[in-house]
């Protein structure tokens, strides 16, 4: 049952403050003292009442805050429940969609595998038919091989004869391949030989041309040498003549020098090989004689005039 604020404070106040009966005394001071005590009790009761009011308000506020928090949590829980239900529905829908996709995929794979097996079966049937036709076509060959095996006891089974035949065929193919390789090598060698011959012919042609040029240069050098030999002979002859002429000139100069010295009555002081000195002496002698003759020529007309 709810209690109003007025009733709550009235009850508390009535419990804490109970009026005491006044004693009938004749003393006014005691009455005054009693009134003061009552006032103090009322003040203390009022303070207690205020404290209780404050405590009650804080309690009510905390209760209200707690109640609001509980309401908020309830709303959050309700939202979480709704979200969880939605999440469960989405998960279930995804699971159902994934399951449907997997079922369709498995069904598609099974259909594809079935089609592949049918195609393979068809191919195997065709291959069996081809093999049967091949066996029928090769049956005469098998009979021939059996008769050949009977005539050649070296081979115990037809497979041995066939293996021998295959060996011979492979050997023949290998020999043919080897022959083709040898032919290719021979063609390559022949081509190299022709190339070398062509190169050698070109080289011989170049060498012949060089030889011809060298022979021509040799002939020209010989002619040039003969020309220089002729010139050298001419130079030697000219040098011999000039040497002879020089010797004669030296002898003439030496004779003139001797004559000059004899004319002067002096001894020979210069070396025989000092041609320039000898010529200088002869030159001075001639100049002196010429000067003397000139003086005589000048003096003779003067004497005649006297």
Curated annotation (Swiss-Prot):
Localization of this protein: Cytoplasm, Cytoskeleton, Cilium axoneme
Keyword Coiled coil: yes
Alphabetical keyword list: Cell projection, Cilium, Coiled coil, Cytoplasm, Cytoskeleton
Matching Pfam families: DUF4200
Family membership: Belongs to the CFAP73 family.
Function, as annotated: May play a role in ciliary/flagellar motility by regulating the assembly and the activity of axonemal inner dynein arm.
Organism phylogeny: Eukaryota, Metazoa, Chordata, Craniata, Vertebrata
Example GO molecular function: dynein complex binding
Gene Ontology BP, a term: cilium movement
Keyword DNA damage attached: no
Ranges in coiled-coil conformation: 49-139, 197-231
Record-given protein name: Cilia- and flagella-associated protein 73
GO cellular component: axonemal doublet microtubule; motile cilium
Database matches in InterPro entries: CFAP_domain-containing, DUF4200
């Amino acid at each position: 049952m709810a209690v109003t604020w007025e009733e709550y404070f009235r009850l508390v106040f009535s419990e804490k403050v109970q009026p005491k009966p006044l004693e009938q005394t004749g003393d006014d001071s005691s009455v005054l003292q009693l009134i003061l005590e009552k006032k103090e009790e009322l003040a203390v009761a009022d303070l207690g009442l205020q404290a209780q009011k404050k405590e009650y308000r804080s309690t009510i506020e905390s209760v209200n805050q707690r109640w609001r928090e509980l309401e908020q949590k309830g709303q959050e829980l309700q939202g979480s429940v709704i979200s969880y239900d939605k999440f469960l529905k989405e998960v279930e829908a995804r699971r159902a969609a994934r399951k449907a996709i997997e079922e369709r995929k498995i069904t598609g794979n099974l259909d594809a595998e079935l089609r592949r097996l049918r195609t393979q079966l068809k191919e195997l049937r065709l291959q069996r038919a081809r093999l049967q036709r091949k066996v029928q076509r090769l049956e005469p060959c098998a009979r021939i091989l059996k008769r050949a095996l009977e005539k050649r006891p070296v081979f115990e089974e037809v497979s041995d004869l066939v293996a021998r035949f295959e060996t011979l065929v492979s050997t023949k193919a290998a020999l043919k391949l080897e022959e083709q390789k040898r032919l290719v090598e021979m063609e390559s060698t022949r081509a190299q030989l022709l190339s070398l011959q062509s190169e050698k012919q070109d080289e011989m042609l170049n060498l012949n041309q060089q030889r011809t040029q060298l022979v021509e240069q040799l002939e020209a050098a010989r002619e040039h040498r003969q020309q220089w030999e002729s010139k050298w002979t001419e130079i030697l002859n000219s040098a011999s003549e000039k040497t002879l002429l020089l010797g004669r000139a030296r002898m003439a100069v030496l004779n003139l020098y001797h004559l000059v010295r004899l004319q002067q009555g002096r001894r020979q002081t210069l070396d025989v090989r000092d041609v320039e000195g000898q010529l200088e002496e002869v030159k001075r002698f001639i100049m002196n004689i010429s000067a003397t003759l000139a003086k005589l020529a000048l003096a003779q007309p003067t004497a005649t005039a006297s």
